[in-house]
Amino acid sequence: MPLLSCSQTFRLPPLHETFSVFPDNGLNPNYNACRAQSRAWISKYNVQVCGPKMRAFMDNCNFELSNAYVYPYAQPAGLRATMDLANILWLYDEYTDMQTGEDAAKAAVTVSKTLLNPEYDDDTWICHMMRDFYVNHIQKCRPNVAHRFIENFCRYTEVVGTEAKLREKNEVLDIPGYVALRREISAVRTCFDLVEYCLDLDFPDYVHKDPIFVIGYNAAMDLVFWANDLFSYNSEQAKGHAAANVVTVIMTSKKMNLQSTVDFIAGFCEALTFQLLDAKRALSLHEDPTFSRDAVRCLEAFGDWVRGNDAWSFATTRYFGPENKIVKETRIVKLKAPVEESVALKE
């Protein structure tokens, strides 16, 4: 188990300073119109799953705003797709957090059957939601992007079942094992697939297998989930779900206290940032414009994701509640008592 800290607070690192090396491209101007459309769409499904308190909580989190931060360049159709995906992921995550490993595995089967065969219908809300998303967006993607998205989304739902089983056992993985798992359960791969869609790119497999591109891709993906784990740690430890969080993993593996772990994460995020920048520079020297132009543009867009994700985390109440702006200014997080201010799915 992780070492306990006598302190009831911890100080967040200034990740916004680390991520300031990525340009600030502002908010997507299509935000308001796409947000209204996406919220109306997801409401058809969350009303079947969530109680009124949870729906109000999810509305206040404003997940759609995150997409305006991380896809500042997207045209309306692309931005709407990213918002719908974000709403799917948050709803699916909240739903499976309350499921056993067996039930989460059943949900994954429904997702896979639906995405691989849109004619499939088991009359569940998950099936109908995923079929809608496929028809509205994925069938409009170019072929390589569509194939990768389906593969990555199905993999995500399969691994969520693994996470649920670990949660049942309260098992804490080692650092390499957790990083490998988190790259899949974070669903960032599916979000990066939509980066290609929004940029009207359709990379062949050899780009995604290129060692330098992989380094940049993985660095960006890890930056997103390390930051998310850091920001969500307080809520997760209060709900008893912190075993599947990089903070707990490092505390346990390295026998560090909480603040030392947070500082370690800050240093690691700096190293990952340099990896992403170095990969972009290396690809810019490539003779093939698929790499020197298109792959570089994609990594630049991943930088939007990293910086925008950090900015949204303090613009929303998702992680820090109504104190989000105070936490942004002071960087001080007060540890919640168990289940304090936790909203159950059916409430």
From Swiss-Prot:
Keyword annotations for this protein, in alphabetical order, are: Lyase, Magnesium, Metal-binding
What are its cofactors? Mg(2+)
Enzyme Commission designation? 4.2.3.-, 4.2.3.88
Keyword check for Lipid metabolism, yes or no: no
Q: Where does (2E,6E)-farnesyl diphosphate bind?
A: R318, Y319
Going by the record, the broad EC class of this enzyme is lyase
Q: Which reaction does it catalyse?
A: (2E,6E)-farnesyl diphosphate = viridiflorene + diphosphate
The UniProt entry annotates the motif DDXXD motif at 93-97
Q: Which residues bind Mg(2+) 1?
A: D93
For this protein, the record's InterPro entries field holds:
Isoprenoid_synthase_dom_sf (IPR008949), Terpene_cyclase-like_2 (IPR034686)
One of the Pfam families matching this protein, by short name: Terpene_syn_C_2
Which family is this protein grouped under?
Answer: Belongs to the terpene synthase family.
The domain comment in this protein's record states: The DDXXD motif is important for the catalytic activity, presumably through binding to Mg(2+).
Q: What is this protein called?
A: Sesquiterpene synthase M422DRAFT_47084
The organism named in the record is Sphaerobolus stellatus (strain SS14)
